[in-house]
Amino acid sequence: MVKSLSEFQLRKRPSWSKKWGVLNLSTVPEAARGKSVTLKFSATASNGQTVSYIMGPYSITNMDRKLDLVATDNKACYLSIADMTLYDAAGAATNAAKIDLVYLYRSIAGITFAHALVSPAASVDYLPGITLPSGVNKSTKMSKTWALNDFNLARLQYGIYVDDVDFQAIDFTNAPNFVINLKAQAGSWVETADGKYRAYIYVNSVNNTTSSMTVSIKRYLMK
């Protein structure tokens, strides 16, 4: 995660992480995604003398992001990382091959469960009261975090940026396929069952009354 005053974020302009040498664009053209770029700065003085400075090459980010998805228990609760979309049961049945996680909220006496993201293939102990649509059966690896307030997702005062290299470095060996007791400013690293995507899911807010949770996602294409 980048913590650097040299990093800047400007709306509709690229942000450059000097530490990692990654151009992080708000909107990345598909043709440029994952490639590299060299920057050349030139100036001409009043006497005609010229000077130029070349920087790079820098890698263009291979990430996408989606903000403020509202997951609601037993409604829009089926999350697809490929689509970065939440589906209800009918939508999940139609897109079964894309469903990676189920959101649920449970208040269980003697157990700290609350807001959870659970793989469809997890033990039924972590899916109480859930009847999965036909074909929804993936096992998604997860690693819970706390206070990793990525600026793009949290939009708080913190100068932390989850970048491409962070997704590459995460070790999912022996990772569980569920996370429970999620709270605002918590999050989870995620790897899809086919290994195609990794993602960071940030929890913006939770609401016990409406059994809902608002999340924002950064997704990284691995292969």
Predicted regions and their residues:
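Surface-exposed, beta-sheet-biased, low-hydrophobicity segments with strongly acidic/polar composition
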Residues: 1-223
